Regions:
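Alpha-helical secondary-structure segments
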Residues: 1-2, 32-37, 55, 85-87, ...
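Aromatic-rich, solvent-exposed beta-strand/loop patch
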Residues: 1-48, 72-96, 164
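Structural transition elements
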Residues: 2-4, 139-173, 192-194
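Ligand/substrate-recognition segments at binding pockets and active sites
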Residues: 10-12, 138-139, 172-239, 311
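Extracytoplasmic/peripheral linker and loop segments enriched in polar/acidic and small residues
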Residues: 115-118, 130-133, 209-221, 225, ...
């Protein structure tokens, strides 16, 4: 690769040095990479990261956080004028879907009922969520789990924001279970508390009581893998740019802890369509199968897709040709620094 390991100080810093025998050259015959070294800092939280960046100690930061988004971004998702002279903004569609999942191994009627699961999908205004909580960064995830930009992603809105329909579904559940006042607990970490509180307010309007349990990230991951949660906030970033990567979360052979099916959703039809898609040689036919699978999965509503994310980088103007890509990989081979 273009860089080689030089130094690692645990929880503090990782240093990579230019590889003197790297095989690539630019169009002028100059050996790549241009940079002599890369230093990666390990910081305790996003606020510390932002402060280091503001003080000029970091050359770029990636992603947005509630603690600093309003300082760096306008309400329309553009770079704040205060930073125009020394920072530039890079944005790209990101192969990441943020969602809330149901643990379907839980036997509580509220979890098992498609009425409640669909009601929540109808009852969350994703557009407002993007506007007010994300400063316009991202797209409402209302067309399925596969993010926009991947072949096989949906074209039709499956769950538009519809309070009337959401209330009707909740009322239908209450008629079937008059002894139950539906209540659910959503587990998250502190970074996404604002998003979960937004959902809590929205669902209160349709007659659902949503409690929020804030857990350390490590505990949340462990319980998500073992099925110890009712609802959980999660994200799925593609390992490779193919929609199969997203659909694998709903295949019965991938139940956690042996695979990424955190919801324990199970459908013979989906399993069969998945195997068929893996056998198909023609890309266009496989993409149509992906689209069909996504639609059928969402009809059962094992998850609530919230938004399709965007990759965002705030970069010092001292840095040239950093670039950005849909998987948010960091390619520094041709990057320079003034």
């Amino acid at each position: 690769g273009p860089f080689a390991f030089k130094l690692w100080v645990e929880n503090t810093k990782l240093v990579l040095r230019k590889n003197p025998i790297y095989y690539k050259q630019d169009q002028n015959g100059i050996q790549l990479p241009y940079l002599e070294a890369v230093a990666i800092s390990f910081l305790p939280d996003k606020q510390s990261e932002f402060l280091e960046f503001s003080q000029g100690n970091l050359d770029f930061i990636s992603g947005i956080d509630q603690s600093y988004k309003d300082a760096l971004l306008t309400a329309q998702g553009e770079l704040h004028p205060d930073y125009n002279k020394r920072v530039y903004l890079l944005k790209s569609p990101f192969l990441n879907t943020e969602y809330v999942g149901f643990s379907l191994q839980e036997d509580r009627p509220e979890i098992q009922s498609e009425l409640i699961r669909k009601a929540i999908n109808y009852g969350v205004d994703r557009k407002k969520m993007i506007t007010y909580l994300r400063n316009g960064i991202g797209l409402p995830a209302d067309k399925g789990f596969i993010p926009k930009g991947l072949k096989g992603s949906g074209e039709r809105v499956i769950y538009p924001y519809d309070v009337t329909e959401a209330k009707r579904l909740v009322d239908s559940f209450k008629l079937l279970h008059p002894e139950i006042s539906p209540k659910l607990t959503l587990s998250t970490n502190a970074q996404y508390l604002d998003l979960c509180e937004y959902m809590q307010t929205q669902l209160d309007q349709i007659g659902l009581d949503l409690a929020i349990d804030v857990l350390p990230p490590s505990t949340l991951r462990q319980l998500k893998n073992t099925g110890g949660l009712e609802l959980f906030r999660a994200s799925w970033v593609a390992d490779y740019p193919d929609a199969e990567n997203y659909l694998s979360l709903f295949i019965s052979q991938n139940f956690t802890p042996n695979g990424p099916n955190y919801t324990h959703f199970q459908s013979r039809e989906i399993d069969s369509l998945y195997l068929e898609a893996m056998r198909v040689q023609k890309d266009s036919l496989r993409w149509e199968l992906y689209k069909l699978m996504d639609q059928k999965i969402m009809q059962h509503a094992p998850i609530i897709p919230l938004y399709y994310d965007m990759a965002v980088r705030f970069v010092s103007k001292k840095v040239i040709d950093l670039g950005i890509n849909p998987q948010n990989f960091l390619f520094l081979e041709r990057t320079r620094k003034r």
